[in-house]
Amino acid sequence: MTEMVPAWVEGRLMPVEKLEAHQRGLRHMAISVFVMAGEAVLIQRRAAGKYHTPGLWANTCCTHPRWGEEAADCAVRRLREELGITGLVTVFADRVEYRADVGNGLIEHEVVDIFVAEAPSDLPVNPDPEEVWETRWVDLTDLAREVKEHPERFTPWLRIYLAEHMERIFGKLRVVQ
């Protein structure tokens, strides 16, 4: 099945096949979700079979909305599909645009709606092995430090979010000094 995502072509938002959007480096819509339990954030290591950035750590989940799908609905859908997480309320936190080389001749040029969801620390997580290699909870401050010390272990977008948009995503109380 071909997955069509919203992308800008010659200034118009239109459906484009997902891989083509990355091959051409087209500006396209995306979502990212951070599930938090207090100061801890749930992160995932991307499955080895992913077509870009396999084996790298990322935020809780991220994807592209389908053509015609609302970003908030997409966030809830991908929490369920990637991690088996249901019942959380996702709250819009920020919109970020970035462009990054993700290897293999692919470019992520995304306009990302970022959502945050609060969860209990005993949240059941059931990752889809086609999407997720492993998950872990990590204190947000420790994660920011890890990303600075070992950027090669993390996806470009997570590095960008934590380096450039921390306060806008997580609020003043969670900003690492």
Curated annotation (Swiss-Prot):
The keyword Isomerase applies. Binds 1 Mg(2+) ion per subunit. The magnesium ion binds only when substrate is bound. Binds 1 Mn(2+) ion per subunit. The active site is at 62, 110. This is Isopentenyl-diphosphate Delta-isomerase. CDD domains: NUDIX_IPP_Isomerase (cd02885). Signal peptide: none annotated. Keywords: Chlorophyll biosynthesis, Cytoplasm, Isomerase, Isoprene biosynthesis, Magnesium, Manganese, Metal-binding, Photosynthesis. Mg(2+) binds at residue 82. It is an enzyme of class 5 (isomerase). The gene is idi. HAMAP family: Idi. One of its GO terms (cellular component) is cytoplasm.
